[in-house]
């Protein structure tokens, strides 16, 4: 090989020394090294490999490197996604640094070749060859594993320089010793120095083997763990590495104090043994370490300090944090009373169902405060992979525990109040069904052995007080719903919202905006107008935002007035929010025939809806618009069938065969479904056909059957509150829904007039003032005599 002259790119080596005739894979990741490699690849693939004096320091100048290295050629390379390179180099020549310079973000150097000075006589060379072979065989005897191929390779080498380079490159000796051997000019001296270092290595291996043999003889099978630890201690002392020993001791102490059950304890000890024997640079080492950190940080036996339930304190906390909701608070206190009597909270799984902003999540916080327990919340909206619940298996890169175990770790106690927020928003995806994964979490018979895939050992969730929240029962699988006690939270009345605003929202927003109570106040008239003309919701979330906007708007005025107290009055609301968004009375003074006010339930509370009907010449067809679902379409068909069978008894001139009827429910962009609009659709079509308007202050809800019966529906409280809010004065309900009025506040009930009906004839009489005769009251003509042909004779 001819020597390469001129400037050649320099690549620093951290923990290795490359000898001539030796090939080695290298990973190039530092910026200067990448620049040097790219320069070499553009030219002739030659590089100079120099070892760093301090492997832990960055290379800023040539003085940070040893002055003797090797000239090597890049045989192959591959660029990785992160911009680094994996290369394969072969060293050709020892070289000494003459001159260096910085060039294009890397170091280039001129070198001189280091040739062996002086020749060895044949006897000396053979003696050194024999000594190296014998010492190499002795070292291989002390190493574990199959070394046959290495022995055969050494036996085939006849050149002393090649054998010296090979043994120096692969022997487990210090980097500084390898560098010293590389720099020695004479081959004989290099061989003698190498023999000296290999002899030291042999003695060290013999000591280690002696320690291992002695320990194996002294200890029994049940003390293998101590043997391995002692071996690693000796090895680390020889290498000067104490970090691994400290980490091992730390984990051992944590495992002893964690209070794990037997199965988890056995897994942790196995993982600790694997950690001890793993290379700290390997991915497996980091995976085991992360797993052990999770296992030792979980609260296996750490519970909250307060175990006894103080019902009086719990009631006081609930009343402090929430106004109204008396029935809900009573249900919660009953649940806590059962827990107190059982002296256990196993099986404590509640579900709060209600519109946004009614206090579902904040009730969970209050329960945690009342019980003196940690509070953990996990948002489940949009979760579509069961690994989010059960965790990922550790075989995957970037694996993590599931949200349940992660929440328990965050709490630091094994009995927190755990909020599963928006559980109705779980969706099935390609990664599995998270709702099915929740079955094991929420089943009191199974969750004492809940197994997270990442944790890989059972964890007891039976002490956790789970509280799920949802806006609707729709979308929640029945098996999952069956495992929870459902508590409905309906919307607030205007009076309740007024009290909540005064007692909770207004003081809270004043504090958050740096205001004192004596600096800013709001009149009762302004607060009422804010509730009726600028917000319309079941909860109080939008109300809280509006109060925050008032505080922001008035803060500037307070500063300009030099801190003088201000009062928010009715006229100020228009300056802050603009024109009124809602009318206190949504119902008009008059509706045309065919338009009727109905009541609906939505996941965000009750609401009113108008159903419109029109007729035109046709062939008896029914046209339905407004994005109506199948059940609602069937209700319209039943209503039309009832009218076809009954209205001709009232008006014989009605000819349905020559009319097309069109029924529309406004807000056509919103899908609608359910049977509760049955009587509303029937009344709307009857009003249109008889050309009689219905009082807009009259609203109704109820399902109808083909016999004309009015059947009960759900969501009565939410619907009645919405009707009252909209200005309705009379409501038609099924007779069997009369019992549901007990849930409605007294101040709302006394403002409304209720009609309880059992048949559609009663509905038509109340709304249209018509008295449709029943079939048994109709005088039918006598049947005509049958002809002989009709009689079949």
Curated annotation (Swiss-Prot):
Its EC number is 3.4.21.53. ATP binds at residues 354-361. It is found in: Cytoplasm. GO terms for molecular function: ATP binding; ATP hydrolysis activity; ATP-dependent peptidase activity; sequence-specific DNA binding; serine-type endopeptidase activity. PROSITE patterns: LON_N (PS51787), LON_PROTEOLYTIC (PS51786), LON_SER (PS01046). GO terms for cellular component: cytoplasm. The active site is at 676, 719. Residues 590-770 form the Lon proteolytic domain. ATP-dependent serine protease that mediates the selective degradation of mutant and abnormal proteins as well as certain short-lived regulatory proteins. Required for cellular homeostasis and for survival from DNA damage and developmental changes induced by stress. Degrades polypeptides processively to yield small peptide fragments that are 5 to 10 amino acids long. Binds to DNA in a double-stranded, site-specific manner. This is Lon protease 1. It comes from Bdellovibrio bacteriovorus (strain ATCC 15356 / DSM 50701 / NCIMB 9529 / HD100).
């Amino acid at each position: 090989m001819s020597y390469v002259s001129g400037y050649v790119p320099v690549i620093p080596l951290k923990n290795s020394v490359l000898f001539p005739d030796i090939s080695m894979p290298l990973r190039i990741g530092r910026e200067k090294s990448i620049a040097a490699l790219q320069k070499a690849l553009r030219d002739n693939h030659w590089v100079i490999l120099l070892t760093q004096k301090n492997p832990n320091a960055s290379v800023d100048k040539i003085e940070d490197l040893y002055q003797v290295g090797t000239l090597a050629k890049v045989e192959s390379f591959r660029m990785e996604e992160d911009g680094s390179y994996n290369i394969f180099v072969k060293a050709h020549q020892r070289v000494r640094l003459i001159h260096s310079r910085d060039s294009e973000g890397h170091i280039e150097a001129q070198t001189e070749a280091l040739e062996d000075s002086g020749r060895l006589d044949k006897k000396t060379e053979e003696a050194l060859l024999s000594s190296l072979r014998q010492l190499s065989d002795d070292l291989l005897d002390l190493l574990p594993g199959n070394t046959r191929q290495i022995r055969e390779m050494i036996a085939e080498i006849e050149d002393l320089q090649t054998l010296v380079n090979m043994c120096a490159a692969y022997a487990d000796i210090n980097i500084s010793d390898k560098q010293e051997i590389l720099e020695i000019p004479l081959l004989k001296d290099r061989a003698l120095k190498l023999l000296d270092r290999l002899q030291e290595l042999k003695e060290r291996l013999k000591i280690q083997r002696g320690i291992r043999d002695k320990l194996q003889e002294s200890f029994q099978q049940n003390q293998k763990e101590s043997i391995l630890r002692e071996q690693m201690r000796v090895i680390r002392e020889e290498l000067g590495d104490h970090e691994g020993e400290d980490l091992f001791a730390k984990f051992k102490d944590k495992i002893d104090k964690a209070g794990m059950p037997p199965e988890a304890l056995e897994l942790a000890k196995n993982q600790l043994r694997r950690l001890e024997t793993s290379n700290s640079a390997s991915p497996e080492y980091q995976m085991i370490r992360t797993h052990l950190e999770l296992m030792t940080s979980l609260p296996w036996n750490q519970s909250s300090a307060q175990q006894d339930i103080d019902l009086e304190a719990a009631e006081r906390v609930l009343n402090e944090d929430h106004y109204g909701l008396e029935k809900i608070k009573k249900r919660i206190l009953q649940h806590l009373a059962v827990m107190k009597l059982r002296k256990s909270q196993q099986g404590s799984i509640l579900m709060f169902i209600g519109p946004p902003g009614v206090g579902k999540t904040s009730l969970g916080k209050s329960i945690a405060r009342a019980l003196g327990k940690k509070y953990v919340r996990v948002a489940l909206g949009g979760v579509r992979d069961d690994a989010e619940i059960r965790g990922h298996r550790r075989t995957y890169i970037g694996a993590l525990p599931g949200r349940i175990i992660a929440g328990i770790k965050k709490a630091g106690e094994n009995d927190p109040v755990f909020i599963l927020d928006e559980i109705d928003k779980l969706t099935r995806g390609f990664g599995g069904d998270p709702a099915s994964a929740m079955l094991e979490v929420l089943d009191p018979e199974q969750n004492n052995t809940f197994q997270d895939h990442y944790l890989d050992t059972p964890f007891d969730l039976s002490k956790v007080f789970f509280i799920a929240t949802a806006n609707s029962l729709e979308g929640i699988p029945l098996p999952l719903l069956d495992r929870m006690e459902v508590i409905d939270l309906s919307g607030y009345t205007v009076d309740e919202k007024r009290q909540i605003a005064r007692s909770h929202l207004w003081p809270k927003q004043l504090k958050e905006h740096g205001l004192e109570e004596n600096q800013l106040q709001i009149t009762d008239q302004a607060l009422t107008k804010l509730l009726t003309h600028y917000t319309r919701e079941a909860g109080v979330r939008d109300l809280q935002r509006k109060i925050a906007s008032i505080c922001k708007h008035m803060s500037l005025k307070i500063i300009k007035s030099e801190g003088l107290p201000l009062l928010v009055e009715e006229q100020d609301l228009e300056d802050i929010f603009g024109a009124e968004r809602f009318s206190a009375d949504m119902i008009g003074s008059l509706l045309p025939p065919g338009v009727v006010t109905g009541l609906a339930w939505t996941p965000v509370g009750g609401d009113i809806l108008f159903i419109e009907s029109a007729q035109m010449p046709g062939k008896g067809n029914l046209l339905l618009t407004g994005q109506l679902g199948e059940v609602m379409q069937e209700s319209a068909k039943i209503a039309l069938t009832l009218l076809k069978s009954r209205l001709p008894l009232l008006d014989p001139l009605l000819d349905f065969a020559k009319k097309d009827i069109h029924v529309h429910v406004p807000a056509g962009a919103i899908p609608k479904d359910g049977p509760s609009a049955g009587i509303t659709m029937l009344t709307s079509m009857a009003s249109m056909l008889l050309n009689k308007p219905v009082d807009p202050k009259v609203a109704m809800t109820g399902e109808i059957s083909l016999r004309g019966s009015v059947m009960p529906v759900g969501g009565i409280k939410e619907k009645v509150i919405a009707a009252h809010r909209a200005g309705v004065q009379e409501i038609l309900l099924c007779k069997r829904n009369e019992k549901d009025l007990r849930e409605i506040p007294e101040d709302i009930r006394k403002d409304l007039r209720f009609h309880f009906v059992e048949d559609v004839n009663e509905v038509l009489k109340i709304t249209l003032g018509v008295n449709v005769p029943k079939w048994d009251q109709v005088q039918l003509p006598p049947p005509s005599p049958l002809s002989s042909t009709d009689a079949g004779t």
